[in-house]
Amino acid sequence: MDIQKQIEIIRRGTVDLISEEELKSKLQKKKTLKIKAGFDPTAPDLHLGHFVQLKKLKHFQDLGHEVSFLLGDFTAMIGDPTGKSETRKRLSREEVLENSKTYQNQVFKVLDPVKTKIVYNSNWCSKMNFEDVLVLSSKYNVARMLERDDFSKRYKAGQPISMIEFLYPLVQGYDSVAMECDVELGGTDQKFNLLVGRDLQREYGKEAQCVLTLPLLVGLDGSKKMSKSLGNYVGITETPIDMFGKLMSISDDLMWNYFELLTDLPLPEIENRKNGMAKKELHPKEIKTELAKLIMDQFSSPSENEEAIQEWKKIHNPKSRAVPDDVKEIKLGEEFFAETPEPLLVWVLSKLSFIPSVSEGRRLIKAGGLYLSEDKITDEKFPIQKGKEYLVRQGKKGKFLKIIS
């Protein structure tokens, strides 16, 4: 694949690429780049917030590059101070190792196990002696550390910052030195730490890595970043029915962000759906169902997911059980589409004698008496599109008609 096409794929959903020219140069010099993303195993499960980075690693993997999933089993015991207003509680070695095992099992739901290197930073960090730590510490200064927003705020507020927290970015940065990475990616909250790795590579006489930052996925609540501790997360090992239920709960505005970061749907197609919803040509629930399915299919089989979706709909639409088994079904002929490719539903229903007239159909809609499945029809100009099925109901317990267009 040519370099510009690779850059387009790599850039999708990213915030920073430092720098694009350097990345192009690396791609020109060697076919296979060393890519890494580090994950501190501070919680037992991976969720869709982690998946944003895993998906980008998969993009690199599909482009033929060498991908390393770095488990920060050593740095997890220090605790990342990023975004914290106070010193974090340290995890025990046992807790970290247990979480690491879980991460390692779950990551292969996304990455190709044959093409993925699982690396632990304790392999080099635990071998460093005090002299090595002093040499590493000499490569950076306190003034630079205080450029970090969270450190700066705590320092100005007179809140304590432990020396071990200053060491965290250095230890994380040293991972890039030890692994000789060409590209490191992480969330936007990790930008400072990623740039420290780039600086340290130069200090140790190595070629500086490119830095790629990705947005922090907003959680189900629509306001805070996805986090297990906040309860606004979707775990990548959740059952299909639970995953579908959670994804259907997100706001209509949030789903466009999920489409871009969590699926491979081309950006122009995402924009088409957005425009279709704005024009009321597409129903938000229909689009959200498609989004959920696209995400779920990356973790479970499509048939299993479809079964789960139908089961969820039955549970959450108890009225749908009242649909008669012998509901009348009509396949629309070409004559219905002779004058327009998308005839109005009320016109079709009047032609099929389901309602007395178009005007009666409009009156029913205004009165809230015409439904598609369990959803009230609110648009008098609701169009019928080819290749779809519509279950129409008149009144809460009225007659049904299934239209196949």
Swiss-Prot record:
Report residues binding ATP: K228
Pinpoint motif 'KMSKS' region by residue range.
225-229
Q: Which UniProt keywords apply?
A: Aminoacyl-tRNA synthetase, ATP-binding, Cytoplasm, Ligase, Nucleotide-binding, Protein biosynthesis, RNA-binding
Q: Which residues cross the membrane?
A: none
Q: Name one Pfam family in it.
A: tRNA-synt_1b
User: Where in the cell does this protein reside?
Assistant: Cytoplasm
Chain location of the short sequence motif 'HIGH' region per the record: 41-50
Question: Which EC class does it fall in?
Answer: ligase
Enzyme Commission number(s) from the entry:
6.1.1.1
The family database entries (PROSITE patterns) matched by this protein are listed as: AA_TRNA_LIGASE_I (PS00178), S4 (PS50889)
Q: Which Gene3D superfamilies match?
A: HUPs, RNA-binding S4 domain, Tyrosyl-Transfer RNA Synthetase
Cellular component annotations (GO), alphabetically ordered: cytosol
Catalytic activity field: tRNA(Tyr) + L-tyrosine + ATP = L-tyrosyl-tRNA(Tyr) + AMP + diphosphate + H(+)
GO BP annotations, alphabetical order: tRNA aminoacylation; tyrosyl-tRNA aminoacylation
Q: Which InterPro entries match?
A: aa-tRNA-synth_I_CS (IPR001412), aa-tRNA-synth_Ic (IPR002305), Rossmann-like_a/b/a_fold (IPR014729), S4_RNA-bd_sf (IPR036986), Tyr-tRNA-ligase (IPR002307), Tyr-tRNA-ligase_bac-type (IPR024088), Tyr-tRNA-ligase_bac_2 (IPR024108)
UniProt family annotation: Belongs to the class-I aminoacyl-tRNA synthetase family. TyrS type 2 subfamily.
Q: According to its UniProt entry, what is the function of this protein?
A: Catalyzes the attachment of tyrosine to tRNA(Tyr) in a two-step reaction: tyrosine is first activated by ATP to form Tyr-AMP and then transferred to the acceptor end of tRNA(Tyr).
Record note on quaternary structure: Homodimer.
What name does UniProt use for this protein?
A: Tyrosine--tRNA ligase
Organism of origin: Leptospira interrogans serogroup Icterohaemorrhagiae serovar Lai (strain 56601)
